[in-house]
Amino acid sequence: MVKKVLLINGPNLNLLGTREPEKYGTTSLSDIEQAAIEQAKLKNNDSEVLVFQSNTEGFIIDRIHEAKRQGVGFVVINAGAYTHTSVGIRDALLGTAIPFIEVHITNVHQREPFRHQSYLSDKAVAVICGLGVYGYTAAIEYALNY
C-alpha cells in the first residue's frame, strides 16, 4: 500500500472553478486538493497526499524529481496542455520510475484533435478522462491501494 501520493496539476488548472465552468465545472483546485488530502486521511492515518500546481513545465519536472527523493510511491497527474506537448514531463516520470495515473476532467477524445495525443498515456498505469472532478477521487483511491 502506497503511503505518499503526489497530486500534480499543470497549466491553467489553478483557474478551476471559474475557467469554462460548462466544461470543467465549478469545483476549485483548492477544493480538489483538500478532498484528496482528506481522502488519504480517511483511508489510512499513515497515508498522505502531497499537492502541487504549476503553469511552468520546468517546475513540474523539478517537482517530479523531488518526489523521488521524498519517497513518493505514486503520482496522480493532470498535466493539462502539457499532456499533448511535454516530452520533458514524460521523461521525468520515466526517469524517476514512479508509477502514475493520468487524469483529465473532460473527455479529451471528444475535444479538438490536438488533444487526442498524449505523451503520457502509453506509460501510465491508467488514464481517467471525462469523469469530471470525480476522476481525481478515483485516481487517488487507486493510488492509495497500489
From Swiss-Prot:
Function statement: Is involved in the catabolism of quinate. Allows the utilization of quinate as carbon source via the beta-ketoadipate pathway.
Lineage: superkingdom: Eukaryota
UniProt pathway: Aromatic compound metabolism; 3,4-dihydroxybenzoate biosynthesis; 3,4-dihydroxybenzoate from 3-dehydroquinate: step 1/2
Organism: Candida albicans (strain SC5314 / ATCC MYA-2876)
Active site: 24, 104
Name by which UniProt lists this protein: Catabolic 3-dehydroquinase
Pfam family, one: DHquinase_II
One GO term (biological process): 3,4-dihydroxybenzoate biosynthetic process
Keyword terms of this UniProt record: Lyase, Quinate metabolism
